[in-house]
UniProtKB/Swiss-Prot annotation:
It comes from Streptococcus sanguinis (strain SK36). NCBIfam families: murB (TIGR00179), PRK13905.1 (NF010480). GO terms for biological process: cell division; cell wall organization; peptidoglycan biosynthetic process; regulation of cell shape. This is UDP-N-acetylenolpyruvoylglucosamine reductase. The active site is at R173, S223, E293. Residues 30-194 form the FAD-binding PCMH-type domain.
Length: 301
């Protein structure tokens, strides 16, 4: 109780929600409660939160905007930090600088408004800029590593530093910050001058492809598995006869087997059980072991 009063006092003015159900915020619509869900408005509030948590030995983590993630049904202890309010985007010539909470799709549309090309590949990728850098998000032959110049990160100790793209150790759905625990707080991208109409047409084409192939009408965590070398996860899952397979309220999408959708009040445990079942069946059928792309965090019930 004393620690709670100290928290309220030292973090006064910051948007803090106590015992907040995370299912309201996740793309899957599953997840238990966070002890303290916080929404910093700027970098200084973020540093205050992290420094307080470290001083008081309270665990903390950043949830981004909870797109390619499954939060377990028991929720998350300590601070869960969401970047919804850290969402400014600025254009300077051919450069775009975006805070980590900026919506990635909206950021690609800002590039379009300024006739800047290079970001079209991301026009349908859900999630935040920070999450996209963390995962080296990509689609249709493009990825964040191709356009990033640098990013500012917050270290686990509460220090802000700048990382150059050459420091980021980018790989397929991988970056340095996955290893270090550094939190991306903003990113700078270098684009190229282009023709507005051409950029718009390419974005419309890619968006149409996504709408045709992906089950965007249901809650989901996006692409569940990484692409195995020389194969497609969705194809392997289909060949194992798993399209439409359901556990609890979660099923393998009929539209795209690489997606798992929440069709009827599914739980995080349903997701975990279905993921494990799919991995096992695909291994039995093809000899290939699928690797998760989606992150699973929090505590089980």
């Amino acid at each position: 109780m004393q620690k709670l009063e100290k928290l309220k006092s030292e973090l006064e003015g910051i948007d803090i929600r106590f015992n907040e159900p995370l299912s309201q915020y996740t793309y899957t619509k599953v997840g238990g409660a966070a002890d303290f869900l916080v929404f910093p408005r700027n970098r200084y509030e973020l540093v205050r939160i992290v420094n307080f948590a470290n001083q008081e030995d309270i665990p903390w983590m950043v949830l981004g905007n909870a797109s390619n993630i499954i939060v377990r049904d028991g929720g998350i202890r300590g601070f869960v930090i969401m970047f919804d309010k850290l969402n400014n985007v600025a254009v300077d010539g051919y450069m775009i600088e975006a805070e980590a909470g900026a919506n990635l799709i909206q950021t690609t549309h800002i590039a379009l408004q300024n006739s800047l090309t290079g970001f079209e590949f991301a026009c349908g990728i859900p999630g935040s800029v920070g999450g996209a850098v963390f995962m080296n998000a990509g689609a249709y032959g493009g990825e964040i590593a191709h356009v990033l110049v640098s990013c500012k990160v917050l270290t686990p100790q509460g220090q802000v530093k700048t990382l150059d793209v050459r420091d980021m150790k980018f790989g397929y759905r991988h970056s340095l910050v996955q290893e270090t625990g550094d939190i991306v707080i903003s990113a700078k991208f270098a684009l190229s001058p282009g023709v507005h109409r051409t950029i718009r047409q390419e974005m419309e084409r890619l968006t149409h492809l996504r709408e045709l192939k992906q089950p965007l009408e249901y809650p989901s965590c996006g692409s569940v598995f990484k692409r195995p070398l020389g194969h497609f996860a969705g194809q392997l899952i289909s060949e194992a006869g798993l399209k439409g397979h359901r556990i609890g309220g979660v099923e393998v999408s009929e539209k795209h087997a690489g997606f798992m959708i929440n069709v009827d009040k599914g739980t995080a445990q349903d997701y975990e059980n279905l993921i494990a079942h799919v991995i096992e069946r695909v291994r039995e059928n093809s000899g290939i072991t699928l690797e998760r792309e989606v992150r699973i965090i929090g505590e089980s019930l």
